[in-house]
Structures are given as C-alpha cells and as structure tokens.
Regions:
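Flexible, small-/acidic-enriched active-site or ligand-binding loops
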Residues: 217-261
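Amphipathic terminal alpha-helices
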Residues: 257-274
Length: 274
C-alpha cells in the first residue's frame, strides 16, 4: 500500500504540523522562485502537494505494482512531500553545484533573469510568455523584433540581461496581448499568451483538443494523461461529502446494521445533505 506525509515517517520533524509551503521551503524548492531583490514567490500548492506529493505517490504505486509482478511480493510505498519536492529540484541542484545557477533569485535563465525567458506585460495590462532559449528560436525572435534586434544580439551576455529585459519590456508594451498573438502566429519562438482562469477553456487549442469539459454548470480539466485504447471519461459531477460511504462499506462486507451503528457513533460520515 502507499502512504504519504509531508515531512516523512521519520526524522526530527516527522510529527510536526505543516503545509505545502513549509515542505517546499525545507526542500529547497521555494527559495529560488521569485524576482530579484524580492521575497520568494509562492507557486500555489502545485510543487509540494501535487507534484512532490500526489504524483510521486502515484508513480511509486505503479512502480511497486510492476515490481510485484516479477517478484510476487508486496511492499509499502512511502512518499514524503519534502522528498518529492527535492527530487523535482534535482536539475537545479546540479546546475548550482556546477556553477551554472546563481543563488540570487531572478538572475538565472530559467527564473526570469533572462530577457528571452520571461513574462512581459502588454499594452492592455495582460501578459505574454516568452521562452526563446535555443538558437533557432532566438533567431526567429530577433526576426520578429526587426530593427530592434541589434540590441539583443548577445543572447548569453548575462551582465546585460537587465538592460535587455527593460528594452524588451518597452517593446512588448506597445501592443495588446491579442495583437502579439497575431504577430507570433505560426512563428516558432516558444511563445504563448498568459491566460486567466476564466479565459483558459475558451482558447482555440484547448477547444480543439478537448482539454476541458463543461456540463453547463461546471467546467474542469478532462482526465489526463490520455490513453489510446482505454480513454477516460467523466461520468458525472464530483461526489458529495460522504455520498458513497454506505456503498463502499457494503462492498467491504459490512451489514446494514453495522453501517448504521458506525454512522450513529460518528466513526464514519454519510452524506451531509441528508
């Protein structure tokens, strides 16, 4: 079976309370995130709870099932969010030790320090994302910039990144986000508009792929990843709290009398709207 905790099953902090933010702080994942000269930026609860926690546990469970097929033996999958978050940081830790990553946040090429890997504000107060790291993408970006390209010829001149970012910010502030969408349409520069939550499901790419499903009352992401043979489907809305308690207990062999007793004493909870 699998089990997941924040701090892990052992260690001096094993029994301490904590939340996603605390786990990624201790794992070294929080400190590098944010702008230069500012405090670390909180990345929602995606890094610890979901990335370092839930996904790592699911991955571990699948690995254990595959191993059991050959060994015939089971085992416990122990997932700690601090371990998972630290694992997600492996490449950054390696870059730091190799001298390719500065300790000061917001000064590296993947944390907003570089002019070619950044989020820029547009004329209408919205934002675009740019990720023109590789030479072919950067060259395409310079073509788009036209006469301004001469100011950005030295892509990896890190000392001049701040100045180049300022100049690029001024350029992108001259058009709206939709106008930049039109400019970059069909050009491989690694570009995408920054979509707000209320916008995301309406984007043509998502609509073409069916990334989101909408039943008229609520919308949510479709199941992912996708399988070629056993396609997942949403059969209905999310269950209400305790909606299937009795059904599940019956599947485990409990009688109606036993279930009623558990509900009466508060050992389990039934539907809260009953």
């Amino acid at each position: 079976y699998g089990r997941m905790t924040g701090w892990g099953q052992d260690g001096p902090m094993a029994q301490a309370a904590g939340h996603d933010l605390n786990y990624i702080a201790l794992a070294g994942a929080l400190h590098p995130m944010g702008r230069a000269g500012e405090k670390p930026a909180i990345p929602l609860n995606l890094v610890g709870d979901f990335g370092g926690g839930g996904l790592m546990l699911a991955y571990g469970m699948v690995c254990a099932i595959l191993e059991a097929r050959s060994s015939g033996q089971g085992q416990v999958v122990d997932a700690a969010m601090i371990d998972g978050a630290a694992t997600l940081m492996a490449s950054t830790f390696a870059a730091s030790q190799a001298g390719f990553w500065r300790e000061e946040r917001g000064t590296n090429f993947l944390d907003g320090g570089a002019h070619f890997y950044e989020v820029y504000e547009t004329a209408d107060g919205k934002y675009i994302s740019l990720g023109s790291i590789e030479p072919q993408f950067y060259a395409a970006l310079l073509e788009i910039l036209g006469e301004d390209a001469e100011h950005f010829s030295k892509q990896w001149d890190m000392e001049n990144w701040p100045a180049m970012k300022d100049r690029m910010s001024a350029i992108f502030s001259t058009k709206t986000r939709d106008e930049w969408d039109a400019v970059f349409e069909g050009v491989d520069v690694c570009y995408a508009p920054v979509l707000a939550i209320d916008e995301v499901r309406h984007h043509p790419h998502h609509q073409a792929r069916g990334t989101f499903v909408d039943d008229g009352d609520y919308w949510q992401p479709a199941p992912a990843p996708r399988f070629s043979r056993t396609q997942a489907q949403l059969r209905g809305p999310s269950a209400k709290l305790g909606e299937h308690t009795e059904e599940i207990l019956r599947e485990f062999g409990f009688s109606d009398e036993q279930i009623a007793a558990k509900l009466a004493c508060g050992a389990v909870t039934g539907r809260v709207d009953q």
